Amino acid sequence: MAEKAAWKFLDTLDSDNKFDFTVINPVGVFGPMLTSDIGTSNSLVLKLIKGEMPACPATHMGYVDVRDVAKAHIFSMLNESTNNKRIIVSESEMFFVDVGRILNTAGFKKSPTKQMPNWLVKIFAIFIKELSGVTKSLGKRVDTDKSL
């Protein structure tokens, strides 16, 4: 909603007051944090690592390192070609069960390697807030255009 409001605001400005605007919209952001708030993306991975989820939801999403998101911000400030654009920042996409398998292979043996039935995800989403946002996209592939 904030992005939509920003674009709408820009449309109301006369030409003397207009300015360049770029939206950096990252997908699931992972990596080192600057504060104790680990964010939604990292909290889901932490739940996998701790074995707090018996299986993975059939969620397909994009992943990007937080440092690459920072680089995208710098890039957009230094390159006029990004002016007045909406940039989706994603390194790769995969199903969440693949993340669980990668973690398991990396030594996090509590991480689930099986996919949870969609009906069960919907029940868990009532109690686990991080899952509430994925119920509408269960089983759907999400592929992002990584070109500028």
Could you tell me what each predicted segment is?
Residues M1-F21:
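Active-site Tyr-X1-5-Lys
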Residues S15-F19, G31-L44, S76-I87:
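Glycine/proline-rich active-site loop of Rossmann-fold NAD(P)-dependent oxidoreductases
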Residues V23, P57-A70, R86, E93-F96:
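Conserved loop-to-helix N-cap of the C-terminal "lid" that shapes the substrate pocket in Rossmann-like
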Residues P26-G31, E93:
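Glycine-rich beta-alpha junction loops
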Residues V29, M33-S36, T40-V64, D68:
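A conserved pocket-lining segment of Rossmann-fold NAD(P)-dependent short-chain dehydrogenase/reductase
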Residues A72-K136:
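Mid/C-terminal beta-alpha module of Rossmann-like enzyme folds, strongest
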Residues F96, K136-L148:
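Active-site loop of classical SDR/Rossmann-like NAD(P)-dependent oxidoreductases
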